[in-house]
């Protein structure tokens, strides 16, 4: 169900909150504005996947991570074209920054580190 067919398309990141709930993100990094068929979700441990949040202005992203201890509700996604946050399991996204990153990891429930474009940044969430 994901955008594919070119060497620049596909899934670029996957994260699981627990053994059942997972989210994958990607797209086409040469056409980062395409915001459909680039996000998929599973609720059964990866047996089935469905597209989610199509046409919601969240185009290509290179990394997605669940917030620890968020019951699988909160996600952070980064890419060379920005940072975005979801509080509803990835259905809707809020754009936080135009700063570009390639990867992100959480230190704890409220602190994440993102890296890319020659920089490392800390994000603090309340």
Go through each PLM region and give its residues:
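Residue-level hotspots at or immediately adjacent to binding/recognition sites across diverse folds
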Residues: 1-126
């Amino acid at each position: 169900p994901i955008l594919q067919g070119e060497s620049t398309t596909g899934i670029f990141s996957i994260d699981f909150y627990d053994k059942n709930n997972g989210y994958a993100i990607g797209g086409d990094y040469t056409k980062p504005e395409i915001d459909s068929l680039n996000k998929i979700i599973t609720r059964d441990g990866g047996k089935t996947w469905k597209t989610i949040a199509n046409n919601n202005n969240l185009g290509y992203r290179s990394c997605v991570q669940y917030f620890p201890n968020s019951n699988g509700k909160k996600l952070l996604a980064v890419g060379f074209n920005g940072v975005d946050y979801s509080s509803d399991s990835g259905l809707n996204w809020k754009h936080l920054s135009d700063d570009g990153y390639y990867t992100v990891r959480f230190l704890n429930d409220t602190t994440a580190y993102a890296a890319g474009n020659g920089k490392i940044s800390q994000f603090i969430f309340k």
